[in-house]
């Protein structure tokens, strides 16, 4: 399945394209940034209120996938072990990500301190993962937030052709949240259906898993999002529980 890596390439380009608008939660500001623009990908000027990196560079979500991809290219037998080493190397002490984490602690006393961060922003799941790996914990993934870091980390691994059972182990290296794990697996099933030629991969997921208790909430959320599909996006966001935004709002 290695020839399916075009999916990761597409995800990387999309991440870089949207990155200058990363985490712009203020709707009025967002509207002003994109006003009059037919194409607001790869904005030259950073608009993220949290951190500032050059246009063309990717966010931490894609970066963790890049670390996995590099681990796979190195062709180790024990991918899990080497992936953890590479996480420490790229995100842990001594890295630009960890340096900026320390600066965040320093700047927090300053109003609007987030805009002072020059360089990448390390995510909560990755902070926990780094600390847990250093502490030799059996399950290293973060548990404090329900985010998509685990999915992003496992995407290249999945596209290399590894099965769903081993996929869970990779996801748990970065996130141990039960909600994040379920949504990550759901996304992988949808991608799998798409790669196998399903006309409507999302509908195929609903059909296959509508009676599966593990995915019941996800199936219901997808149906809810599809009913709201014609609504103005901010209205949809407010309607759907924030906990479950990881998957359905993209459908």
Predicted regions and their residues:
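A short, hydrophobic C-terminal helix/tail in secreted or cell-surface proteins
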Residues: 246-251
């Amino acid at each position: 399945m290695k020839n399916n890596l075009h999916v990761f390439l597409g995800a990387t380009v999309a991440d870089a394209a949207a990155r200058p608008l990363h985490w712009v939660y203020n709707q009025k500001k967002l509207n002003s940034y994109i006003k009059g623009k037919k194409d607001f990908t790869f904005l030259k000027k950073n608009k993220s209120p949290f951190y500032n990196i050059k246009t063309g560079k990717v966010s931490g979500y894609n970066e963790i996938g890049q670390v996995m991809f590099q681990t796979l290219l190195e062709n180790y037998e024990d991918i899990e072990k080497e992936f953890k080493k590479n996480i420490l190397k790229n995100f842990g002490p001594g890295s630009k990500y960890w340096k900026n984490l320390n600066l965040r602690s320093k700047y927090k006393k300053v109003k609007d301190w987030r805009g002072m961060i020059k360089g990448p922003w390390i995510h909560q799941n990755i902070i926990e993962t780094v600390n847990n790996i250093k502490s030799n914990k059996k399950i290293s993934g973060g548990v404090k937030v329900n985010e998509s870091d685990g999915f992003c980390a496992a995407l290249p691994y999945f596209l290399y052709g590894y099965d769903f059972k081993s996929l869970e182990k990779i996801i748990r290296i970065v996130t141990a949240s039960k909600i994040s794990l379920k949504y990550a697996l759901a996304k992988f099933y949808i991608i799998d259906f798409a790669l196998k030629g399903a006309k409507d991969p999302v509908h195929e997921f609903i059909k296959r898993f509508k009676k599966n208790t593990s995915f019941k909430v996800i199936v219901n959320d997808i149906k809810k999002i599809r009913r709201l599909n014609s609504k103005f996006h901010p209205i949809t966001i407010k309607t759907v529980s924030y906990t479950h935004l990881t998957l359905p709002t993209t459908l």
